[in-house]
A protein has these predicted regions:
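Short, well-ordered secondary-structure micro-motifs
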Residues: 18, 45-49, 86-87, 109-111
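Small/aliphatic-rich secondary-structure junction motif
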Residues: 3-48
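Gly/Ser-rich helix-loop-strand patches that form or flank binding pockets
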Residues: 88, 92-131
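Conserved hydrophobic residues forming the short capping helix/wall of the S-adenosyl-L-methionine
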Residues: 26, 61-65, 89
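Short glycine/serine/threonine/alanine-rich loop segments
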Residues: 31-32, 70, 94, 125
């Protein structure tokens, strides 16, 4: 456990907090982090802008990991967030997830908040939920 930690991010301060905790776990267990930014396929109207945002977020995550001595593997994809997180988790052999409980707007019911709820119900690996 904790060999490959998935950290989904939307670039919010809540996601940053989840990343900080994942980095601490990774340092303790000599783990790598699989950072995921998923462009929800239903938001294709602003695709270019969101893709640029996603790339910037992943660069920031990788830079932070490098500074802390933790290997970060980046994944930016377009699709259904839950389905594609499951695909990435299986392909990369993720064995745990560190995720925030709130979305960008501080809501527990929008975007990552609702996705978090679905992740908890779907995934059968350890999940660290960050408030």
């Amino acid at each position: 456990m904790f060999e490959n930690i998935m950290v989904p991010s939307d670039g919010s301060k809540h996601s940053d907090k989840a990343l900080d905790i994942a980095i601490e776990i990774a340092k303790k267990f000599n783990s790598k982090i699989t950072a995921v930014y998923i462009l929800d396929e239903s938001t294709n109207l602003f695709y270019d802008s969101l893709e640029n945002e996603g790339n910037e977020i992943l660069k920031k995550i990788s830079k932070k990991g490098k500074k802390e001595g933790v290997m970060i593997i980046e994944h930016l994809i377009t699709g259904d967030p839950l389905r594609d997180m499951e695909i990435i988790a299986k392909k990369t052999q993720v064995d745990s997830i560190v995720i925030n409980s709130k979305g960008k707007d501080n809501s527990q019911n929008i975007m990552i908040g609702s996705i978090t709820d679905r992740i908890i119900k779907t995934f059968e690996i350890p999940i660290v939920l960050v408030k």
